[in-house]
């Protein structure tokens, strides 16, 4: 049974921890399909430093996440280059093998979705059975092909109230 890896990336929004709660809830409901859920401390940088924490499959421990702003696991704005030009993918591959990762969940905005896309192409090129999924969140509302994303509404509300 493969394990899952979740990472937060980009600017912390009022909803990024809510997304993490949703991931934990999905994990708890699918422990027959997912062995362990790991969270990377400080996004992709945590993966590169092997700085992962195991998230327990006990939803009651994480109830506060639904209402907690910020990024509890920390975040990163590190951008990966193209796989053929960036040797950091080798380290990411080593970590994925070490933890028997079958699913990588990248929570963030435009740059984070770019990272998810690059990771997906990298693992596909290696013919690795690793599913990479982007979980959109952005205060900028700059993800193409979307009307709006989680994080945008709360950012607009905050700015509007701040200038009134």
Task: Enumerate the language-model features and the residues they cover.
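Glycine-rich oxoanion-binding loops at beta->alpha junctions
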Residues: 50-102, 111-113, 135, 139, ...
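Short coil/turn connectors at secondary-structure junctions
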Residues: 1-4, 32-35, 67-70, 99-103, ...
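N-terminal phosphate-binding or glycine-rich loops at protein starts, especially the Walker A/P-loop
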Residues: 1-51
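Short catalytic-loop micro-motif centered on adjacent basic/acidic residues
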Residues: 15, 104-106
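Short glycine-/acidic-enriched loop or helix-start segments at secondary-structure transitions
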Residues: 16-17, 49, 115-117, 144
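Short Gly/Thr/Asp-enriched flexible loops that form oxyanion-binding sites at enzyme active sites
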Residues: 19-23, 110-127
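Generic secondary-structure signature for well-ordered alpha-helical cores
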Residues: 25-35, 42, 78, 97, ...
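Short, ordered loop/turn segments at secondary-structure junctions
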Residues: 9-11, 40-45, 77-78, 109-110, ...
């Amino acid at each position: 049974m493969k394990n899952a890896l979740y990472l937060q990336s980009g600017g912390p929004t009022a909803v990024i921890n809510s997304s993490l709660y949703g991931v934990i809830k999905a994990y708890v409901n699918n422990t027959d399909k997912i062995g362990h859920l790991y969270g990377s401390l400080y996004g992709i940088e945590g993966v590169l430093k092997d700085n992962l924490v195991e998230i327990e499959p006990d939803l009651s421990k994480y109830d506060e996440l639904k209402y907690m702003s910020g990024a509890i696991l920390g975040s990163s704005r590190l951008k990966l280059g193209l796989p053929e030009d960036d040797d950091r993918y080798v380290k990411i591959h080593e970590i994925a093998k070490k933890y028997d990762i079958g699913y990588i969940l990248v929570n963030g905005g435009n740059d984070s979705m770019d990272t998810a896309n690059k990771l997906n192409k990298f693992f596909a090129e290696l013919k690795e059975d690793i599913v990479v999924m982007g979980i959109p969140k952005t205060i900028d509302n700059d993800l193409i092909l979307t009307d709006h994303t989680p994080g945008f509404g709360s950012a607009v509300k905050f700015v509007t109230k701040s200038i009134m």
